[in-house]
């Protein structure tokens, strides 16, 4: 899937004045492209408040990061669970009205989650880096900053806000971007979960021999519909490669019951990312235990 970056608006000069005119391809083709295009604006606004240089100055005072992959592999629950804190989504709107991130984090940790994923996108998911920072103060579990990362600035902001890991989405990043952003994360001691949505993206990521955490997203990011067959079909072809190269495969989205979890474990999935399934429940701990009681 190809996601374009926002084309710059051309300018027209009339005598001594210049006017920006809409680019003829300045309309996003799908939700993911719309989100990525807005990120450019969001990052510029962030930099007006806190510069990259100011973020870097804060690094020395931070504690060491926690090992995201190790936490998944050592989980008593199989597969290891990346439990997500998410208030809303573009396709479903507000998912959890009574949204108390710290209490949600407590519930996840008590239930046996390996790690916690925190949505930091504000415009489309009603998340924030402030929420990430609050959750960091509420739990000792490794934290994943779940955002649409296109800039090194976001990685520094995630680290300063308490994240131990970041998400990189293969569909929105060039090869050069992936290499560069992975290097930045490595230098900050952060883990990288790289996300793929189809076999073509997976082949591309495997060819780099760079990532040891690969998330197979069962959600079509053009339509935001989910289908567990995405994970099943990719694991049927590539589980041996994952094992050979010590890659930890994570199945993301669309996981709803114990039978699906058993199936994922049987095909070699080591971790699952579950968010909406828990966010819709009043009693998260009860829902968590019910989902994993027979695994």
UniProtKB/Swiss-Prot annotation:
> Which is a Pfam family this sequence falls into?
IGPS
Catalytic activity as recorded in UniProt: 1-(2-carboxyphenylamino)-1-deoxy-D-ribulose 5-phosphate + H(+) = (1S,2R)-1-C-(indol-3-yl)glycerol 3-phosphate + CO2 + H2O
Per the record's keyword annotation, is Coiled coil included, yes or no? no
Q: What class of enzyme is it?
A: lyase
What pathway is it annotated to? Amino-acid biosynthesis; L-tryptophan biosynthesis; L-tryptophan from chorismate: step 4/5
A single GO molecular function, which one? indole-3-glycerol-phosphate synthase activity
UniProt keyword list: Amino-acid biosynthesis, Aromatic amino acid biosynthesis, Decarboxylase, Lyase, Tryptophan biosynthesis
Q: Give the SUPFAM superfamilies listed for this entry.
A: Ribulose-phoshate binding barrel
What InterPro entries is this protein classified in?
Answer: Aldolase_TIM, Indole-3-glycerol_P_synth, Indole-3-glycerol_P_synth_dom, Indole-3-GlycerolPSynthase_CS, RibuloseP-bd_barrel
GO BP term, pick one = L-tryptophan biosynthetic process
Q: What is its EC number?
A: 4.1.1.48
PANTHER family, A to Z: INDOLE-3-GLYCEROL-PHOSPHATE SYNTHASE, TRYPTOPHAN BIOSYNTHESIS PROTEIN
NCBIfam families of this UniProt entry? PRK00278.1-4, PRK00278.2-4
> Which family is this protein grouped under?
Belongs to the TrpC family.
Protein name, as recorded: Indole-3-glycerol phosphate synthase
Organism listed in the record:
Prochlorococcus marinus (strain MIT 9515)
| Organism ancestry | Bacteria, Bacillati, Cyanobacteriota, Cyanophyceae, Synechococcales
